[in-house]
Amino acid sequence: MNSVHDLGGSEGFGSIHPEPEDIEPIFHNWWEGRVYALVRMLGLFGLWNIDMSRHARERLHPVDYLRNSYYENWLAGLETQLFESGLVTMEELLEGIAKGPAPKELRERVLLPSDVKNTPLVRMSYFRDT
């Protein structure tokens, strides 16, 4: 079943104007890298996997999904996962303030550079060969 996230072959969405590859930044705004890092870090901690993360983004309302930027959809998916996993309450999300500490087992985890380097999805370069 196709949804709003799978527009391959669909008409009526206008032309696509990608940025030239030689000047396209990895992240367009400072917060995008943080969202990406949080999603990946919490995945490394075993709270969810890449399929669960994608599913959270794909469940966004179609209007929001199409209106949002790529990393705005990642942020919305992250918020959904944090709430559904019980790590945050809706009140905490809305106010942007934690009402208490994170679970002890998460506070005690330390993510080392070697943990990140040895993760299959980040072994590759994010830069394109030119």
Task: Describe the function of each predicted region.
Residues 1-130:
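A charge-rich, low-complexity, intrinsically flexible signal that marks solvent-exposed coils, linkers
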